[in-house]
Structure formats: C-alpha cells, structure tokens
Amino acid sequence: RFLNQKRFLSLDLTYGYPLGVPMYNYLMENGMTPKEYEWFTHNQVKGRCIMRNDYYVTNEHIVHPDGHTQAAGEIFGYYVITSQYYHRYRLPIMHTETNIKMPASAEWLLKQWANVHRLKRDGVPIVGFTWYSLTHQVDWDSALRDDAGRVNKLGLYDLDRKIMPVGTAYNKLIEN
C-alpha cells in the first residue's frame, strides 16, 4: 500500500493534491521541512499541465511481503493505470511513450491504441499518442552505458530507414 501511494507522490506535490498522513510523514522523515511542503501547496501548476504517461511491459511490479519487487509484466495495463491517474488529477493525458521488441511490437501497438481509444470513449481527454522510437536504438538496453553496438529493434523503422511491421501498423492507424 505504501509503495502504491508513493508512486503518486511527485505528482501530488506538483499538482497540489492533498497528501495523506503516511506520505506527509514520509516526506518529513526524509528531510523535507514543513515550510518546503507549504511551498508546494501554494505553488502547484496543475492549470497549465498535460499529464504524460509512458507505458511499457516493464512498468508494473509485484511487491512481495518482504518488500522486494520484481517486474510483473502487464497485470492492470495502460487503461487501468491511466484511469487511476486521470481520476486523481483530472488532467488531459498524452500516451507519450511505449514500445516492445519485435516481433511483438505490432500487437503491442494495437493494444495500446485500443486502450487509448477506450479511455477517450470513457470521457478521458486524450491529446496524443507516441510510439518510441522512430528508429531502432543502439545500446538502449544498457541505457547507453555500454558502447557495444547492440541494435535494439524497437523502432517504426530500422537504421537503414526501412519500415518495420510496427511502422506499417502505425501508418494504418493514422490513416484511419
């Protein structure tokens, strides 16, 4: 429960969402002063924001009784998680980043697109959608820490500008 509340903390401060006692205590125990917290309550920027949501198959985690976490794959999915954020903050949303390695990428794209349309149909103001990235990445699997020259096949196009199946699927979505 604590980690679930903590995932909202930075946005709660940014958007002026009232904190519960556990999160307030967590901030105070970890170095924030009451005066600093008060600054956030008077300087929220919600009125000028669009919420951006990245969603990858690695986003969701299982929290074990001893507190350690592990990647869980897709349990709730983009629709459920984004609905939670929308109902909490009531901001327009852009699905800003998603991908998965080939050959699952075209299917993943269609699933994310369907989630975006379901949210829109349910009244959530969706303002955009992005597949990341336009081209395959090099050494993205190591967050660019290793200069190994590994091509990560995540793009709409390969590094020779040849369209990938996910790129073709993206084009069809845009055409419709």
Regions found by a protein language model. Give the residues of each.
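Active-site region of glycoside hydrolase catalytic domains
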Residues: 1-107, 114-176
